[in-house]
Amino acid sequence: MSYQIHQNQIPERLVSFEGKEYRWLGGTNYLNIGTHPLFQEKLQEGIRMFSQNWGSSRLNNYRMDVWESLEHTLAKRFQVEAAALCSSGLIAGQIALQYIMQKYPNAAISLAPKTHPALWRHPHKPAPGEFSEWKKDAQILCMDGIGAPWVEEFLTGFEQNLSADQTLIVDESHRLGIVSTQIQTPANLIQTSSLSKAFGIPAGIILGKKADIDAIKQDPFWVGGSPANPAYVYACLHAQEAYD
């Protein structure tokens, strides 16, 4: 039996329901970073500096350094060449997939079973059946880094046997900032993620090779989208110790 719990506060480790306390095991807010004093302090600073939001394109002639600073910080943290911030994890996934589909317009695409909708693109949907039955011979492969809400390992070694002419796009929303996201593969690897799950900010990110990220930052879908909220980006950038 399932329940809907209606409350006006973000849950922490425990939630109350019908007079009893239960452990909260939802698929977000993993670190409860919003309660960390350093994050709260830096978010307040960010709001004072950047007000409520900034919706202009990142390629506008008026630019702020805070976005690139966090991109460099997260690229270094996750040991990739470059990163591109987006307004959400779903947008990050869609932009990455759109970019690869334009780069290889005739390529076959295969989505693993249970892949998050962030990596869906009509008419392509996740393959039916179990992950072990998924055929991984398409040029573009999309999958989740780990199953959610039920934890399920997907990267079991097949990725090491892919070829260099394949592209593997992995949604890391439920691993990034929690466990290692290092993937050893000959394929061209692009990782996307929500930054709300562990990092606690309303944003998404694309991680990959510098050539891919540079090209994505010229793509109309990235250029035309509003950037991540700069106040939250500032908080994440200057509260990195809170995530360690």
Locate each region found by the language model.
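N-terminal "arm"/small-domain region of PLP-dependent enzymes with the aminotransferase-like
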Residues: M1-W54
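General beta-strand structural signal in soluble alpha/beta enzymes
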Residues: W24, A83-S87, I109-A112, M143, ...
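Short, small-residue-enriched loops and turns at beta-alpha junctions
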Residues: N32-I33, L59-M64, P117, I146-V151, ...
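Conserved N-terminal alpha-helix of the aminotransferase class I/II PLP-enzyme fold
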Residues: Q40-S88
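Conserved PLP-anchoring active-site segment centered on the Schiff-base-forming lysine
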Residues: E81, Y99-W120
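Active-site phosphate-binding strand-loop segment of PLP-dependent enzymes
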Residues: P126-V170
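Active-site C-terminal subdomain of aminotransferase-like
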Residues: T167, H174-D244
